[in-house]
Amino acid sequence: MIKQDVQKCVDALQDFVDKEIGESVNLFSCKSRANNELLLNIDEKFQLKDKDELHQLGEQKIENQNKLQEIRNKVEYYEKLLTELEEAQKELEVRYKLVSKSK
């Protein structure tokens, strides 16, 4: 009798485990299909660049950064030049005033 009760418990436990495994497998399958569909949609929307094109874009980026740095250097040079010209203009104004007063 105990053996039968134990067997019933084992059978009930096995049924429960089988049911849970079935539900888990079903849920996993549904999520896998949904993820696969999502990946397909993403793949359609966003085309990946090939290695050559990515390399070319990288080189273009470096070239653009170098050009930008050159422009920044020129701007800095012209700003310094402007400051020097403003100082020279002030000196000339002072000299002009001194010359005008001495006449």
Curated annotation (Swiss-Prot):
Cellular-component GO terms for this entry: endosome
Any coiled-coil regions, as ranges: 51-102
The keyword Magnesium is assigned to this record: no
InterPro entries reported for this sequence: BLI1 (IPR020491)
Keywords noted in UniProt: Coiled coil, Endosome, Transport
Pfam families the record matches: BLI1
Superkingdom of source: Eukaryota
Subcellular location: Endosome
Similarity comment: Belongs to the BLI1 family.
Job of this protein: Component of the biogenesis of lysosome-related organelles complex-1 (BLOC-1) involved in endosomal cargo sorting.
Subunit structure: Component of the biogenesis of lysosome-related organelles complex-1 (BLOC-1).
Protein name listed in UniProt: Biogenesis of lysosome-related organelles complex 1 subunit BLI1
Lineage: Eukaryota, Fungi, Dikarya, Ascomycota, Saccharomycotina
Annotated gene: BLI1
